[in-house]
Amino acid sequence: MFQLVVLLACSWILIRIVEKGDLSVLGLRPTSKRFVHGAVLFLLSAACCSAGYLTRVFFAAERFVLNPAIDAGLVFTGIWSNVSSVLFEELLCRGVGLYLLIKLLGRSWAVLISAVVFALLHWLNSGVFGDPLQMLLVFAFTFAMGLLLAYAYARTLSLYYPFAIHFGWNIVQNFTFPDGPFGNTLLVQMLPVPEVTVSYAVFLSIFLFPKLAAIVLNFFAVRRMTPALKAAPDAS
């Protein structure tokens, strides 16, 4: 919580110094349109992420059961951990900095820079340094997702949309299923984990298809939205 407050304060100071603006550039005023569109993006991401786990159950014989330690505290902590982490990353990578980059460099360059920063941030957080293949895979997915999230903000000038996409994926991966860093999950994996040999097609359907589907479906959903910024149309 303290980190969020500090980041918001720094964002306000930055926009105030650069163009005497305020945090309204983040597009956080709630409207029915933003709620409906955000809900659609959230559900698309959550459904795509869930599909990956369902294929693991079907093809890899993995089993997940309700966490025996579940209680109200675990649920609250698990949800809040994901809300705060996603919000922090959105403010850092798609907040005032992205808004100013759009005005300075145009949308295409701003989106590209934001995506690179997002990918590098996940390199630091995922502990993959020293493993070239893992570094490549993490960078490829997070860079592609970073492009989508930055594009969502650049097109709509609202953090609701990148937040909804990002949170929809993370809440399934990190809270519903036990693949996140926080440890407070609704489901846990039954042990021992089965050792199953699958084809390359099945492997790709488990680990690659859900990610690609989330990026592609959300991209087209965002693309259908009315652009909020008429200047620097090169990234529309």
Predicted regions and their residues:
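Alpha-helical transmembrane segments in multi-pass membrane proteins
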Residues: 1-15, 36-43, 72, 76-77, ...
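Hydrophobic cores of alpha-helical transmembrane segments in multi-pass inner/ER membrane proteins
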Residues: 6-14, 45-46, 81-87, 146, ...
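Juxtamembrane helix-loop-helix connectors linking adjacent transmembrane helices
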Residues: 23-91, 98, 102-104
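Aromatic-anchored segments of alpha-helical transmembrane domains
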Residues: 46-54, 115-125, 167-179
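Small-polar-interrupted transmembrane alpha-helices in polytopic inner-membrane proteins
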Residues: 82, 86, 107-123, 142-143
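Membrane-interface helix/loop boundary segments of multi-pass membrane proteins
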Residues: 91-113, 154-158
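Functionally important transmembrane alpha-helices
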Residues: 137-193
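C-terminal membrane module of polytopic membrane proteins
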Residues: 171-236
